[in-house]
């Protein structure tokens, strides 16, 4: 809870600012193409997911209730995180019936997945004024950090289904 040194919360309302925002976007597109009607079909699907996350903080000079001198450190912080993810899948499927009792379905496909993230974070202090709430005004850089990470996966797969008169089934799958 509040202590005796906390003072009036309304006093701090404009002294300690913190703004943040997140933008998320998702895009998806795909198609089905009948190369040979009802027998050979190509399917593709692609998806993109993007996130931007930004945070800005700034502490104006302020006087704590029980302190003898004001806090003049004027700390500023900025953080930015960007993420991208994409996925692409494609399959080619062949379906046919031979001599009215032999049913065959063969599928060949592949998939590509990519995810990466970029993070940037920095802090400064001792800005000369409460009117410049950005990192460039701080005379003392206290923290700087940036990092990139990511991974990719490429895979292929195949499946063959055979049945005789819809009674006996043989299925082979590979990935």
Please describe what each predicted stretch is:
Residues 46-48, 61, 109, 125:
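Flexible domain-boundary/linker segments
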Residues 1-11, 56-74, 116-144:
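Surface-exposed loop/turn segments flanking beta-strands in extracellular/periplasmic regions
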Residues 109-116:
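Glycine-rich, aromatic-flanked loop segments that form ligand/cofactor-binding clefts
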Residues 102:
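Histidine-centered active-site/metal-ligand motif
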Residues 9-57, 77-97, 105, 117-119, ...:
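Outer-membrane beta-barrel transmembrane strands
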């Amino acid at each position: 809870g509040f202590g005796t040194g906390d003072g009036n919360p309304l006093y701090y309302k404009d002294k300690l600012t913190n703004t943040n925002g997140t933008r998320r976007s998702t895009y998806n597109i795909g198609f089905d193409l009948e190369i040979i009607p009802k027998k050979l079909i190509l399917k593709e699907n692609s998806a993109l997911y993007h996130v931007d996350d930004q945070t800005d903080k700034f502490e104006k000079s302020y006087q704590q209730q029980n302190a003898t001198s004001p806090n003049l450190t004027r700390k500023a912080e900025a953080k930015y995180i960007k993420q991208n993810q994409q996925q692409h899948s494609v399959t080619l499927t062949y379906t046919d019936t031979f001599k009215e009792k032999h049913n065959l379905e063969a599928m060949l496909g592949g998939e590509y997945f990519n995810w990466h993230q970029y993070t940037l974070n920095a802090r400064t202090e001792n800005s000369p004024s409460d009117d410049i709430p950005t990192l460039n005004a701080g005379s003392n850089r206290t923290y700087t950090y940036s990092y990139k990470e990511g991974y990719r996966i490429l895979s292929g797969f195949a499946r063959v289904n055979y049945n005789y008169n819809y009674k006996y089934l043989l299925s082979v799958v590979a990935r």
